[in-house]
UniProtKB/Swiss-Prot annotation:
It catalyses: Endonucleolytic cleavage to 5'-phosphomonoester. NCBIfam families: RNaseIII. Residues 168-237 form the DRBM domain. It is an enzyme of class 3 (hydrolase). Gene3D superfamilies: 3.30.160.20, Ribonuclease III domain. Its cofactor is Mg(2+). It comes from Helicobacter pylori (strain J99 / ATCC 700824) (Campylobacter pylori J99). Its EC number is 3.1.26.3. Digests double-stranded RNA. Involved in the processing of primary rRNA transcript to yield the immediate precursors to the large and small rRNAs (23S and 16S). Processes some mRNAs, and tRNAs when they are encoded in the rRNA operon. Processes pre-crRNA and tracrRNA of type II CRISPR loci if present in the organism. It is found in: Cytoplasm. Keywords: Cytoplasm, Endonuclease, Hydrolase, Magnesium, Metal-binding, mRNA processing, Nuclease, RNA-binding, rRNA processing, rRNA-binding, tRNA processing. This is Ribonuclease 3. The gene is rnc.
Length: 239
């Protein structure tokens, strides 16, 4: 006897190659062409790609994530909220959410991008995620996007707070520089001062022998994290 629930499921169709993706997302697209467009990188040279959807998705996600953080962290001031949002609304942040649904497995990229592992690049993967969320917004509205993002944040982050996200900046930067420049950042101690119980460390961060940031902290690790945050912002602005 067939399971009635699976029979009536919006995901179950004989010709749906995106079944697993839609299940992971928690949303079944009514128009599969819209879904395909969201997954199509411009390198494919097709009439429709995901650039316009990416533009819309960027605005939608900025609003949804900003709203979620506003309600969740009522004790944070504007500066802390901005820092939190910058961590999530970024190539690294969206790549993390995209990988939570294995989005990279469904991207449509050119053969040259395939050879260079383009589907794993944060720039391509994060853009596709923005486009995907724009597609959901166009079909189902803001409330559905909000629900999906809340679920993905819970899935992708063990703890969603400033301290936890801040400690991830070094990893985020290393992933980005490996993808863009095929190198990892290096850190150098510039100065150490103060008594043992109240030390202050100043670190510098270099990418391809170019200094990208300097920062101070109560430990080398803290200063390195602050350097990584600054470098991420610079690379984001340079795109």
């Amino acid at each position: 006897m067939k399971n009635k629930r699976s029979q009536n499921s919006p995901y179950v169709t004989p010709d749906n190659p995106y079944l697993t993706l839609e299940k992971a997302l928690g949303y079944s697209f009514k128009d599969k062409r819209l879904l395909e467009q969201a997954l199509t990188h411009k390198s494919c040279k097709l009439a429709l790609n995901n650039e316009r959807l990416e533009f819309l998705g960027d605005a939608v996600l900025g609003l949804v994530i900003g709203e979620l953080l506003y309600h969740k962290f009522y004790q944070y001031d504007e500066g802390k909220l901005s820092k939190l949002r910058a961590s999530i609304v970024s190539a690294h942040g969206f790549t993390k959410l995209a990988k939570a649904i294995a989005l990279q497995d469904y991207l449509r990229v050119s053969s040259s991008e395939e050879i260079s592992k383009g589907r794993e690049k944060p720039s391509i993967l994060s853009s596709a995620f923005e486009a995907l969320m724009a597609g959901v917004y166009l079909e189902a509205g803001l409330a559905k996007v909000r629900k999906i993002i809340q679920n993905l944040l819970n899935r992708a982050y063990k703890r969603l707070d400033l301290e936890h996200l801040f400690m991830d900046y070094k990893t985020a930067l290393q992933e980005l520089t490996q993808a863009q420049f095929c190198v990892i950042p290096t850190y150098q101690l510039l100065q150490e001062k103060g008594p043992d119980h109240h030390k202050e460390f100043e670190m510098a961060l270099y990418i391809q022998d170019k200094m990208y940031a300097t920062a101070k902290g109560k430990s080398k690790k803290e200063a390195e994290q602050q350097c990584a945050y600054q470098a991420l912002q610079k690379l984001k602005e340079a795109k």
